[in-house]
Amino acid sequence: MENTPQQQLDLIAQMIKTAQRRFYDDSPFYILWGSTVMIASLVQYVLLLNHNEYNAIGWAILIPTAILLQLIFIRKQQKQATSKTHIEQVLNHMWFAFGISLFIVLINANKLQLNTYPIVLCLYAISTYISGSALKINAFIVGSIICWIAAVIAFFASFETQLLLLAAGVLFAYLIPGILLRKLEKEAA
């Protein structure tokens, strides 16, 4: 028996809603990485202004801590795992590709030099735009647009200014949407 066009549309809408509800569970990741990158950027900015030779210490402490916390979150989610919709599977693959791409860019930062953070901002923009579009969450789309604007500016900015642009980018692309998702998750519960 074949579904009517309306039944097919209803099924797609239901899949999107299911993916949205599960996406709310990912709010800790956005809050974690948004706050981690924002704080590390601002710490490095302040230390650079004070001519501190250990200006990257925030990254050295915060990134490994965030990775450890993310692994704990993932393990907790895997214990509660259910089957994933097609949209969720595609988004998982997209985030995996984002992580690999980010890693490649960051390990080549010495070669990229002042182009590193503008490229990172573009990667943030692409990933949050795709997520926001797929799940119809406007906060991510707005955040991605802000990241793209910050990336364009960053290509012409000093390293210190790039740190501020990076902090602003993750504030709008990760932290604020993550907090909004958390709020929606609590309202849905």
Language model features with spans:
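N-terminal juxtamembrane cytosolic/stromal segments of multi-pass membrane proteins
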Residues: 1-26
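C-terminal ends of transmembrane helices
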Residues: 18, 69-84, 126-133, 178-185
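Selected alpha-helical membrane-embedding segments in polytopic membrane proteins
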Residues: 21-107
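Hydrophobic core segments of alpha-helical transmembrane domains in multi-pass membrane proteins
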Residues: 56-63, 118-125, 165-173
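Membrane-proximal helix-loop-helix units in multi-pass membrane proteins
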Residues: 85-144
